[in-house]
């Protein structure tokens, strides 16, 4: 009845392949801002996360950071890390840059980013955070919730690492930090459509959103719900409100540009 998945690229592809059906729900319209749901009612965000910078405050001056392009500055050569461009979160980040700035400027971004890598991309987002804390690199591009998970993991090493690094929200003077989501849609031939809609309505209610925010350290999509304590401690930030379908449209182009720019 329901497809639930992470990443706007996956939700957009499901819509393009005609796997989802449109839903009209006043409850969902009230619970979810318009840029976080499909204009045809085929998918709806349930949680969201920011693609942000985690940095070592001993070696990085945050006054020198700005948008994602700031990581291509010569002063950051040999200091930046992130995971592979084949990862869905980096594909969607690059797709959002293409949507805002076009292909030519996005290729410049990729080439500049790769030129500043401290190492070839490897590992997941937690591995990038650990590498920053260990001194292998100075700044990483990661999803926000990974730091929250590490800070509350019960693993003393990871909890200490989470205290050592700092968070920076990119593009606060321009587009806002890139947002990705986990979302849900009703499958095209769902036998229990009405109950499926009720489930998504519940998942975006204040009650469920509070539980999700506290449980996985993602940002709630329902504006009435506050994030978990550690997430809130990073401060409020400006998020990119581009309709996420515009990001999904550029996912394939993002793969091409990452390949052309040698982002492994």
Write out the residue ranges for each language-model feature.
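A structural signal for short loop-to-beta-strand junctions that line the ligand-binding cleft
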Residues: 1-6, 21-53, 69, 80-81
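Ligand-binding clamshell of periplasmic/extracellular solute-binding protein-like
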Residues: 1-21, 140-147
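Short beta-strand->loop
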Residues: 21-29, 43-44, 69, 139, ...
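A bilobed periplasmic-binding-protein/Venus flytrap-type ligand-binding module shared by bacterial periplasmic
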Residues: 52-59, 179-192, 211-212
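Short loop->beta-strand "edge-of-pocket" segments that line small-molecule binding or catalytic clefts
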Residues: 70-88, 96-98
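Periplasmic-binding protein-like
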Residues: 78-86, 202-226
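Ligand-binding pocket segment of bilobal, Venus flytrap-like solute-binding proteins
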Residues: 85, 92, 96-170
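Extracellular/periplasmic bilobal clamshell ligand-binding domains
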Residues: 227-264
